Amino acid sequence: MHQDFQEDEHEYPDIRRNPLHEVTMTSYILGILLGIFVGLFPQIRFKNFNLFIIALSLFHFLEYYITAKYNPLKVHSESFLLNNGKSYMAAHSFAILECLVESFLFPDLKIFSYSLATKLCTVLGCLLVILGQYTRTIAMHTAGHSFSHIVKTKKESDHVLVKTGVYSWSRHPSYLGFFWWAIGTQLLLLNPLSLVIFIFVLWKFFSDRIRVEEKYLIEFFSAEYIEYKNKVGVGIPFI
């Protein structure tokens, strides 16, 4: 048994980068948050906010879980992406603030049954959140060891060009999934201001990030990536 562990130890995450107390507490808090808003679902008038918190909790949990399961050598306590930069925190804080202010000033406008528009936005938001999460999760699973939360400037030994599964119809499916997931959350919250801001900021962010990342991917894989790029789009409009 000890010999088997030694043979497979390269597949296990580095415990020094995964303090168990941090991972355990983060998972516990996300689970509590999800449980609270599932439990409050029948009691809160604006149920869309509950759905948003549930989706947000699941997103951050799955970021760590999928990385740990399918890319264990790269997992670390920051893989939850809770510390995803000041811009990320500011965007969600603004969205929640807008939702709460509008719920106080115009409570009826935040109700699913208020109008056909609120019903359509809610249903479309739910669909985008589900499809976006599914696309990102499957992308991380499919890429396996080749997936990274940060742009790689040097080619690693286990980095291969993945062109199968979701990568056969989008060359950046994890970005595609997050783009539509995030837009879906703002439709779900019925946030007109945040919806416009999210679309603009996310489009600019992914446009710049993909341009930088693909410069390195061309260095790593040369003509193979250029051919792949010419055949497969991204899926985010105008990128």
UniProtKB/Swiss-Prot annotation:
Substrate binds at R209. One of its GO terms (molecular function) is protein C-terminal S-isoprenylcysteine carboxyl O-methyltransferase activity. It is a multi-pass membrane protein. Changing P173L: Abolishes function. Its EC number is 2.1.1.100. It catalyses: [protein]-C-terminal S-[(2E,6E)-farnesyl]-L-cysteine + S-adenosyl-L-methionine = [protein]-C-terminal S-[(2E,6E)-farnesyl]-L-cysteine methyl ester + S-adenosyl-L-homocysteine. S-adenosyl-L-methionine binds at H159, V160, L161, V162, Y167, H172, P173, S174, Y175, E213. GO terms for biological process: methylation; peptide pheromone maturation; response to pheromone. One of its GO terms (cellular component) is endoplasmic reticulum membrane. The chain crosses the membrane at residues 24-44, 48-68, 89-109, 111-131. Residues 1-23, 69-88, 132-175, 207-239 are cytoplasmic. Its main location: endoplasmic reticulum. It comes from the Eukaryota. It is found in: Endoplasmic reticulum membrane. Optimum pH is 7. Residues 45-47, 110 are lumenal. Keywords: Endoplasmic reticulum, Membrane, Methyltransferase, Pheromone response, S-adenosyl-L-methionine, Transferase, Transmembrane, Transmembrane helix. Residues 176-206 dip into the membrane without crossing it. The keyword NAD does not apply. The keyword ATP-binding does not apply. Gene3D superfamilies: 1.20.120.1630. Present with 2690 molecules/cell in log phase SD medium. Mediates C-terminal methylation of the isoprenylated C-terminal cysteine in A-factor mating pheromone and Ras proteins. Does not have a preference for the farnesyl or geranylgeranyl moieties in the model substrates N-acetyl-S-farnesyl-L-cysteine (AFC) and N-acetyl-S-geranylgeranyl-L-cysteine (AGGC) in vitro. Belongs to the class VI-like SAM-binding methyltransferase superfamily. Isoprenylcysteine carboxyl methyltransferase family. This is Protein-S-isoprenylcysteine O-methyltransferase. It comes from Saccharomyces cerevisiae (strain ATCC 204508 / S288c) (Baker's yeast). The lineage of its organism: Eukaryota, Fungi, Dikarya, Ascomycota, Saccharomycotina.
